[in-house]
Design a protein with these regions (language model features):
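Short acidic-aromatic low-complexity motifs
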Residues: 2-31, 35
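A beta-strand edge to alpha-helix "cap/lid" segment located at domain peripheries
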Residues: 3, 8, 60-159
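Hydrophobic alpha-helical segments, principally membrane-spanning helices and signal/leader peptides
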Residues: 8-9, 36, 52, 95
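Short, mixed-charge, low-aromatic patches
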Residues: 10-19, 42-43, 58-62, 148-151
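Hydrophobic pocket/interface hotspot
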Residues: 16, 28-29, 36, 51, ...
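Alpha-helix C-capping/helix-to-loop hinge sites
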Residues: 16-19, 39, 69, 91
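Small-side-chain structural scaffolding
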Residues: 19-22, 36, 41, 84, ...
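A solvent-exposed, acidic/Ser-Thr-rich amphipathic alpha-helical stretch
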Residues: 25-81
Length: 159
């Protein structure tokens, strides 16, 4: 694994948010690998957003149609993996609303660009599904737990 440059990754996230706020399509593209994916919880149309082009176009649309602006509340960059997590607020000026959430970033080791974002935010649980999770994210392939740790014990209590 190549060395992790925490300052560069934090600066890239800030540059990404500045490009979002400016609705700058070219600047947004420059933050991502061409095949980047942005995952979201259920409720938005056409998710996940696949490719840098799609991600850039969707954020420009939000700025133009919703009056979107974002603030970064916190950034935490890993010291031993090419990942980061942030807290943000998405201000929807034309709607007079805001949404708070977190995002998990995965960076491409060679280019240093964003290759994946997983968004988690304050939204109501969907009572129609057994597990509320990101749409089309490969939880199984990534090794996530698919049931509680104590699911196989007789009483349900941890051993």
């Amino acid at each position: 694994m190549s060395a992790v440059n925490q300052a560069n990754y934090a600066a890239l996230i800030r540059r990404y948010f500045a490009a979002c706020n400016a609705g700058d399509h070219a600047a947004l593209l420059s933050c991502f690998t061409p095949d980047a994916v942005h995952y979201f919880p259920a409720g938005l149309p056409d998710i996940p957003w696949r490719t840098a082009e799609t991600i850039a176009a969707k954020w420009v649309w939000c700025v133009e149609n919703l009056g979107s602006q974002w603030t970064i509340e916190k950034i935490l960059v890993s010291h031993d993996s090419h990942e980061a997590v942030i807290e943000w607020t998405h201000w929807k000026g034309k709607l007079g609303t805001a949404l708070r959430g977190d995002e998990w970033y995965v960076f491409d080791e060679q280019s240093g660009l964003i290759k994946e974002i997983r968004a988690y935010y304050a939204s109501p649980a969907d009572k129609e599904v057994a597990i509320n999770e990101l749409v089309d994210f490969d939880y199984t392939g990534r090794g996530y737990n698919l049931e509680p740790a104590n699911a196989h014990t007789k009483s349900g209590a941890a051993k």
